[in-house]
Every structure is written in C-alpha cells, then in structure tokens.
C-alpha cells in the first residue's frame, strides 16, 4: 500500500515527523514498511522562472536565448526547447543545482545530474529550464506536460517560488506491506487512522455532507440482487448533466503520487475514492442501460462477454454479472463491459458501490484470466458498511468539482446487515498472554485510538465493522501489544518444570517404517491429497468401485485438484513416472499420507482418514525385492513370521498373478504387487514397477517393541529336509501355513532352500525343498517324536496334492 505523506497529513494535520521517522514508527506498531520513495530526490535549487525575453541564437538555428526572471535576479539561459514563449512560467534549475534525470525519459542516475553554468555555441547559459522527465516524473502523472519540451505552469505561481513544491513533488511515498487480514489498511483513511493512533494525534476523516437534488433516484433506476451471498450489499446513485473536465490539481497530484494517471474529473473521482476509502466503484452510462434496471446474477455457462479492454471472455455459472433488463453490462467486482462504457458525450451516469464475496471474485478473476485493481481489493473481503460511505463521498466530490448534478436519494440493497461484534474485555488474560502489566485504563485508551468502543455495562469491547480481523481475546491482546510497544514488553523465560518428552506409539511405529525403508535405499516424498476424478480411470477402477466414492472439494484450485484421494497410488506412480522420464534408472520411493474414505455422501460426518505407507520401486528389483523390504518392516515391529501372503485379483491396477494381500491373524494389513501393464501405459511408463501399500491404522495395534531374552539353546536341534513335488499354482505360503499349524511349538524354524522346474519334473509341476528345524527347550528330542510331527505335516500336504520327491 503506497501512502503519500502529504495525503496522510490531510487527515492527521498535527503529524510532525520525517518520512523515515513515520515509516519506522509505523513499522513498530504493526504496519511493516517496504520502502520510502522521495519524490523530490535529486531536485535541488529549482525555482519558478518567468521568461521575460527571447532572442535567436546568433550561431545556431535550433537554439534560443532566454532572459528568465527567477525572483531575485534575471539570468540568461540558452535552450533548444521548441515550446516556450515570452511570459511563460517554467521550472528553472540554477547554477550548482541538480535534476533527477535527462529529458529522454531513460533511467535516472542514482545521484541525478548536476547543472553548471557554461556556454552553448559561444553564448553563456546560467541555468536550465526543465522538462517534466528531468524532474523525475512523466506525462502519465502530469498529462498537461508537453510531449517534447519544457514544462509550463498553468497555475498561480510567481518567479522565485519553489518549483518542486509547486509541482507537488516535495513529498515522500511510503510503501507498506499490508497483510490480507487488515483490509481497512488498504485505504488512505485506514492508514491515516493507524498513523493517528501510533503518533497519538487527532484523526480528521473527510466530512461528508448530504448531496442530491429534490428528485428520487428510484425514478431513474431499479436494482434486483438475485444472489445475496455473492453480493451482500449493492448501492447505486445517479448523476445527470455530466460535465467532463480535468480534475483539480490537488486531486491529480495525490493520484500521481499513488502511481495513478489522472484522466478527467469523473474517472479521477472514482479512483480517488477507491484509494481514499478502499472501496472500488464503477460508473455506467445510464442511457445504455435497458429498462433502467440493474440485475445482479450469476452468468450462464458459456456466455461470451466483451470487457472494457475489448477482449471477449467466456463466462461460467460461478461468475457474478451486473446486468440490465436485457444483457450483461459488467463482471461484478472485476471490470465493466464495453457496451456500457463511459464516453466523452455521456449525459447521465449510474454510480455503483457494492460489496462482493471475496472468494468468488478471486476465483472468477482466475477463471477468466483478468485481474484488476478493483478485483484485488474485493478479493480480500471488504466491509459492507463502507459501500454507502464511499458512494456519498464520491457524490460529494461530484458536486464540489461541478462534474454533474446528483439525483436525490440512493438505492441500497442490503438485506442482511453486518452484525456488531462484541468481545469481553479480559485485561488479566491479555496481560498473562503478553507478559505485561497494563491497566484497564491504558487498554481502553489504546482501543479508543483505533475506534474500538466499550460498553461499561457489559464490560464488552465493541468492534467496528472495518476491523474484520478482531474475533477473540488474543486479537485484542495483539492491539494492546502494538501500542504498548513490542520493544517495551520484558523478555522473560517461561515458568514450569521441564519434563522428558515421549513420542506416541503411532509415531514410533511410523519412524521405524521410515528408517527401515531408508536403510533399504528408499527416499521419502509427499504428494497432494487432492486429485482429479480421472485418476480412477487411469487406475482401471470399475465404475462401481468404492474408491470412486470420493469427497468433492467445494472450491478446488482446478479439476486436477477437485477430490480428496481414496487410494494412495496416483501420487506414487506420478512421482515414479517423473523419475523415469528424467532417466533415473533405479528409483525407490516411499510416502506417508492419508486417504479419505467418506462414511456417506454427501458428508454428514467427518470421513475416515487412514494413514497409508506407500512404497514404489523400479529398476534392479522384482516382486521379492519389495516383499523383502515389507518383511524387514514387519520384523522391526516384532511381527516377523506372523504374516501370510494370499494371491489376489481384487486390485485392478495390479498385474494379475503378481499381486498379494498381506494378512496377520486373518486381518489384512497391506497389499503388494506389480503394476498392471495398462496402468503403466496410462502413466507413460515402460518396464516393471512394484508397489506395496501398508494400512497403518491396522498395522499399528499389532506392532510391539517388547523384546524377550532367550538364552543359548541347551539342547540340540534336529533337522529334516523335505523335497516336494507339486503343481505350479500352489504357493509356498500355503506350505508354510501347514508347517506352522502342524509343527507346533517344537518347530523352531523353516527355510526354503531350493525351487526347481525342468526336464526331471513333470510339465506343470515344480520341486520345492525346505529345511525344517525342531528343538525342545527342556529335553533332547527323539527321532520318533520328530518323525511323528513330519508325518502330520506330510498328511496335510497330501490334501493339497503335494508329494515327496522320490
């Protein structure tokens, strides 16, 4: 927010400080200063001069010799300017003075340009007459300045006056970084109020008088708002007998200091009020409005609309439009239409000052690709109470500047006025929060400076509507801190005893999973929880898949981020595809992230948020590489040897025959497999990719960090090797389940040591060999005892069609 010091002083006349002092103190009170720009930088010894006499240069056709009265003397200046005449009043830099830059409008040197007396083609010159560019400004800010040549004053100045002061350049502009919650500070009145409070000076806002003739505005225009949620307030007034002319110099100078080019009285008034009150306004030519009616409604999807800049734009049903009885005439809060623009021959004007929903304006501006100064203010969320105040101020300026005749009355559609916010005054809690000892009287004095009221009967602070950032005790405490002075708050250490922290069990389990993954060469990542509905098709999920029942985002960033994910694989596959596209040959990634499973749609209660650990890899790896990593994780969580792998076809995104569900005690904790070839194509990947997804809410209760010590075995073990022949479709997991079930407590371990398929085995069969280890803790086992157990195992294996290999 740019704030010219001279404009601030118009509302705080007793403000007596340098621009830097102003900036520093405002920063300490919470308005962070970005920069200070001095408009008179490098402008030294520049006065008003009157050209008394002009003669031709004897040796140069394009030069003239001027005798210039600079107040206390008349000096001779040689110039090539084509636009000066005798009697003109011009800015003159005297010998030894300095200007900001050259007349070519290029970048000004840091230290300006020093002017010395000298000779031009043999004739002495004791100074220089200045163009507006040499004074560090431009024709955009001073439209009356000539395109080429010397600036000529058209106001009441006299020789010897300070030319910099006369041009309004004896000023400084302080730029502040205003946070979005302080909407009131995006206006000169708001910043002046802050300055008055900071420096303990009186604040004098503009005194707005009643305007309007004896006519009734309702005879000129009717207003209907169809969507009060998107337009909580709409005000309108009518001005007739418009007289376009340049705005007064004081208004032009203030706008110029803000970086706004003066145009004419009508445009300048709307810009001036927008900067003064922070309320954007718009003007329509009333004669172009059909049926003399304004309708505020949503656009229809696909509507085409041409804005003031001549661009045709496509609307959707979320964009709010300003319409007349037949057509759209403006995009609410963003830009008016070319079909209702104000031209030089305008006779009757409709003024609009409204409050639009900030979120809708921001999203609409993004959708149609158009952002303006007005939309930038609206999207922050304006105070509805400010709309009519700004409207009345604009109409007052219309009358004061003779720009037209204001019709009596105003249209004000405001069905749901803002409710007054009241907060309990809790001084003790404020002091406890801040570490201060401020009295109630001091607190109320601070609040009075920023126009916060106080109801003594209820001990409540009354928050004005323009302070939309004050909602709770902590917000009020911050206001106390700002004016008490952050630098005055003593530095103290917190009281209390230090206690040793302890991680929750769930976090400890996640840390173990991370550590094991990283020890196996995996890198952690994080992807968005927002996804596109198109993900379901990429993952080959059927139309009736429960994963398609996803929560929709009410205000998404775009279609690609419009739902909450119900399956965690898309982010992992996208990351792997990106790495593959960058020719990374061997990649291992893991991610911890939630999936969001709604209990019902539309939502009636919070969804089930389930943390998933997703692992993905490609390159020098296969199914069993990833299976080994998962088993490492389970071993580290005290779950080694408890898991079972069951082939599955329930996951359409996994390769059939190369996918398994992982269960512990009959409960599924994860799934693992190779990505389906069609899914690989959908993500533009080649080769083989393996993934595993662990459901942490199911895994965590089963994990344990308890470890029992067992001494060295006192009794010898007995080993039995079993070489078995079976059909290829029998999985080793089925064999191992039988080993555990029938081996009992005496089966210490089992180990797969050979798998064979070849000429010596019947086609469609395979040979699998296991080593079984038996041991008793309290005795030496007998051969017959072990043989009996092995027989039980073999009997059960025969039921699967498994035979001992001859």
Features from the language model and the residues they span:
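Terminal amphipathic helices with adjacent charged low-complexity linkers/tails
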Residues: 199-225, 402-430, 437
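Phosphate-backbone binding interfaces of nucleic-acid-interacting proteins
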Residues: 1-215, 350, 369, 373, ...
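A carboxyl-terminal module marker
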Residues: 449-452, 469, 599-603, 608-609, ...
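Conserved mixed alpha/beta core segments that line enzyme active sites in large multi-domain catalysts
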Residues: 48-78, 159, 264, 270-339
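Extended, well-folded interaction surfaces typified by the phenylalanyl-tRNA synthetase beta subunit core
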Residues: 423-585, 720, 773-776, 781, ...
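Mobile "lid/hinge" segments at catalytic clefts and subdomain interfaces of large enzymes
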Residues: 121-130, 134-136, 140, 145-149, ...
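Glycine/proline-enriched, intrinsically flexible loops and inter-domain linkers
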Residues: 24, 64, 203-304
């Amino acid at each position: 927010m740019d704030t010219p010091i001279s404009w601030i002083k118009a509302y705080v006349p007793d403000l007596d400080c340098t621009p830097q002092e102003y900036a520093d103190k405002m920063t300490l009170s919470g308005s962070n200063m970005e920069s200070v720009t001095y408009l008179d930088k490098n402008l030294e010894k520049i006065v008003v001069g009157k050209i008394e006499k002009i003669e031709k240069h004897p040796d140069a056709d394009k030069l003239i010799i001027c005798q210039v009265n600079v107040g206390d003397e008349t000096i001779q200046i040689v110039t090539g300017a084509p636009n000066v005449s005798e009697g003109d009043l011009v800015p003159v830099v005297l010998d030894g003075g300095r200007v900001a830059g050259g007349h070519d409008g290029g970048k000004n040197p840091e230290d300006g340009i020093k002017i010395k007396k000298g000779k031009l083609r043999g004739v002495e010159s004791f100074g220089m007459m200045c163009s507006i560019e040499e004074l560090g400004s431009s024709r955009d800010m001073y439209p009356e300045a000539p395109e080429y040549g010397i600036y000529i004053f058209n106001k009441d100045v006299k020789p010897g006056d300070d030319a910099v002061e006369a041009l309004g350049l004896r000023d400084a502009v302080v730029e502040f970084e205003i946070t979005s919650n302080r909407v009131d500070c995006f206006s000169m009145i708001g910043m002046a109020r802050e300055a008055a409070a900071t420096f303990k000076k009186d604040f004098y806002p503009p005194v707005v008088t009643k305007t309007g003739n004896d006519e009734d505005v309702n005879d000129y225009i009717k207003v209907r708002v169809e969507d009060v949620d998107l337009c909580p307030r709409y005000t309108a007034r009518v001005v007739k007998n418009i007289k376009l002319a340049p705005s007064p110099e004081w208004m032009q100078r203030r706008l110029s200091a803000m970086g706004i080019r003066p145009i004419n009285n009508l445009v300048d008034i709307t810009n001036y009020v927008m900067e003064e009150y922070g309320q954007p306004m718009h003007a329509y030519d009333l004669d172009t409005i059909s049926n003399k009616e304004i309708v505020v409604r949503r656009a229809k999807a696909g509507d085409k609309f041409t804005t003031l800049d001549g661009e045709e734009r496509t609307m959707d049903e979320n964009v709010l439009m300003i319409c007349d009885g037949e057509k759209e005439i403006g995009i609410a809060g963003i830009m008016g239409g070319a079909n209702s623009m104000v031209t030089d021959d305008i006779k009757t004007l409709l003024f609009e000052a409204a409050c639009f929903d900030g979120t809708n304006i921001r999203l609409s501006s993004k959708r149609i690709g158009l952002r303006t100064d007005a939309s930038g203010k609206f999207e922050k969320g304006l105070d509805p109470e400010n709309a009519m105040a700004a409207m009345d101020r604009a109409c007052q300026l219309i009358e004061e500047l003779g720009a037209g005749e204001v019709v009596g009355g105003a249209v004000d559609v405001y069905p749901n006025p803002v409710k007054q916010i009241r907060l309990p005054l809790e001084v003790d809690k404020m002091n406890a929060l801040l570490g201060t000892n401020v009295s109630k009287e001091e607190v109320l004095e601070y609040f009075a400076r920023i126009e916060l009221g106080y109801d003594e009967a209820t001990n409540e602070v009354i928050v004005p509507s323009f302070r939309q950032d004050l909602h709770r005790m902590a917000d009020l405490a911050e206001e106390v801190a700002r004016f008490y002075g952050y630098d005055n708050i003593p530095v103290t250490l917190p009281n209390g005893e230090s206690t040793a922290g302890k991680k929750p069990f769930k976090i400890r389990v996640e840390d173990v999973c991370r550590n094991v993954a990283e020890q196996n060469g995996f890198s952690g990542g994080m992807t968005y929880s927002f996804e596109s509905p198109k993900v379901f098709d990429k993952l080959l999920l059927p139309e009736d898949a429960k994963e398609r029942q996803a929560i929709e985002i009410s205000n998404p960033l775009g279609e690609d981020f419009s739902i909450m994910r119900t399956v965690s694989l898309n982010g992992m596959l996208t990351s792997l595809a990106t790495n593959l596209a960058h020719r990374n040959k061997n990649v291992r990634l893991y991610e911890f992230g939630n999936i969001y499973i709604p209990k019902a749609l539309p939502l009636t209660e919070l969804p089930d948020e389930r943390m998933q650990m997703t692992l993905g890899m490609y390159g020098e790896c296969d199914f069993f590489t990833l299976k080994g990593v998962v088993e490492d994780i389970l071993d580290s969580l005290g779950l080694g040897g408890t898991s079972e792998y069951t082939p599955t076809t329930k996951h359409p995104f996994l390769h059939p025959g190369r996918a398994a569900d992982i269960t512990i005690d009959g409960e599924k904790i994860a799934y693992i497999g190779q990505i389906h070839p069609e899914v690989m194509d959908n993500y533009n990947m080649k080769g083989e990719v393996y993934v595993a997804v662990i459901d942490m809410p199911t895994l965590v209760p089963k994990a344990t960090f308890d470890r029992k010590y067992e001494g060295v075995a006192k009794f010898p073990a007995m080993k039995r090797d079993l070489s078995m022949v079976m059909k290829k479709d029998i999985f080793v997991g089925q064999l191992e389940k039988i080993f555990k079930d029938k081996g009992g407590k005496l089966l210490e371990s089992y180990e797969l040591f050979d798998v064979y398929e070849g000429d010596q085995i019947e086609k469609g069969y395979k040979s699998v060999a296991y080593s079984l280890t038996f041991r008793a803790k309290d005795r030496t086992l007998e051969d017959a005892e072990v043989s009996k157990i092995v027989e039980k195992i073999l009997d059960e294996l025969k039921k699967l069609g498994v035979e001992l290999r001859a």
